[in-house]
From Swiss-Prot:
This is Adenosylhomocysteinase. Its main location: cytoplasm. Its EC number is 3.13.2.1. GO terms for biological process: L-homocysteine biosynthetic process; one-carbon metabolic process; S-adenosylmethionine cycle. The keyword Cytoplasm applies. Pathway: Amino-acid biosynthesis; L-homocysteine biosynthesis; L-homocysteine from S-adenosyl-L-homocysteine: step 1/1. May play a key role in the regulation of the intracellular concentration of adenosylhomocysteine. Binds 1 NAD(+) per subunit. The gene is ahcY. NAD(+) binds at residues 150-152, 184, 213-218, 236, 271, 292-294, 339. Keywords: Cytoplasm, Hydrolase, NAD, One-carbon metabolism. One of its GO terms (cellular component) is cytosol.
Amino acid sequence: MSYKIKDLSLASEGKKQIEWAERHMPTLMEIRKRFKAEKPLKGINISAVLHVTKETAALVKTLKIGGANVALAGSNPLSTQDDVAAALVEEGISVFAWKGENETEYYSNIESIVKIHEPNIVMDDGADLHAYIHEKVSSKLDIYGGTEETTTGVIRLKAMEKDGVLKYPLVAVNNAYTKYLFDNRYGTGQSAIDGILRATNILIAGKIAVVAGYGWVGRGIANRLRGMGARVIVTEVDPIRALEAVMDGFDVMPIAEASKVGDIFVTATGNTKAIRVEHMLNMKDGAILSNAGHFNVEVDVKGLKETAVKVRNIRPYVDEYTLPNGKRVYLLADGRLVNLAAAEGHPSEVMDMSFANQALAVEYLVKNRGKLEKKVYNMPMELDYEVARIKLKSMGIQIDELTEEQKEYLEQWKSGT
C-alpha cells in the first residue's frame, strides 16, 4: 500500500482522536452499521481530497467498511492532523498528506491519489481534485460521479458546468440543508473563533469585529462574535444579505469605512481580495486579519507581503507585518482557513451531518451510475431528510407527522377563506 505522511509512529494517538470523533458522530455511525451489512460500495475506488481530520477519518473508515478502496489527500496545506493521517494508514487507507505542505507537495499529493487507483468516485473539498482531473488527466477514467463539500467548490463546479466541460455528474453536498444550515453556520461560526483565540489569546469582548460576507458562514461568525461581547460590523456586496445583516442588528458599511475602525477582521466571502492593501493601510495599528473562506485569496496576502517593510513571526500562526506608514497588522495562519490551520476545525457533532451526507451521496452516485447527466445536482431531499431524522433520533428528539387529512389539504387548491 502506498502512502506519504509525516510520521507513522503517531498512529496510536491518532486512533484515540478518531475514537473521540466517532463517539460524537452518531448519524454517521448509524450509516456505517448499514454499510457494514450491505457493502454498497464493494469494489469501488474512491479518491478524496478532504481536510485530514479526525472527523474525516470517521467518514473514510465508513466508506472502507462499506467496501470501498479509498485514497486520501489533504484539501489544505495546513489542515492535516498528522496523527490522524498515521492512524488511517494503519487502517489500510492510502493517505498522502501532512501539515505544512508547500504548493508543489500539495498538488503532487492530489496527483498521487488519482494515480494510485483510477477512481470511480471523486470526493472533494474546494474542487481542486475535480479541476485536476479535468485539466491534467488525459486518460479516460471510469468515473461514476463526484461530490463537493464546500460553497467555494460548488461555485467552481457551477462555472465548469456553465462552460460545458464537466466530465461526470456532481452532487453538491454543500447544498444539503443538513450541511449548510449547520456546518457553515454553527460549525464555522464556532471553529473560526476557536482558531482566532488559539492563535492570539485575545479578549473578544469590547473589540470591534469586521466580518466580510454575510452568507451562512459569515452570519455564524458574526453572531458568535456578538455573543462573546464584540461590536460587529458586516461588509457585503449583496444588497439582500446586507439588508438581512441590518435586520439582524449588525452595523453594515463598505470595507473602506470598516477598515478604519475594526480590531479583528474575518473574511467569509468565497471571493478574492475582500481585504486589499488599500484597506490595510487604513487600519488601526495592531489590527488582526483572519480568513474563514476555503482559499487563501480573501485577504490580499501577496499584496501585503510586497507592501510590508518588515515581517516577523510573533506566535505560532501569527505574523506581524509593518506597513510603510509604521502601522502593524497581524495576519493569522498566512491567510488560510483559520479554523483548521490554527485550531482543529468544526466540532464532530456538526461534521456528523456533513459527512453523513457525503456517505449517502457516494452511495447515491454508485446506485445511479450511468443515469445522471454531467451537471451539478443538489443533494436529493429524501437523503437530506434521512440525515435529519437519524440526527434527531440520536438526540432523543421526536417530531410530529402529517395526518392524512393534513396531507390531503396540502395537495388541494379549492379550499380558501
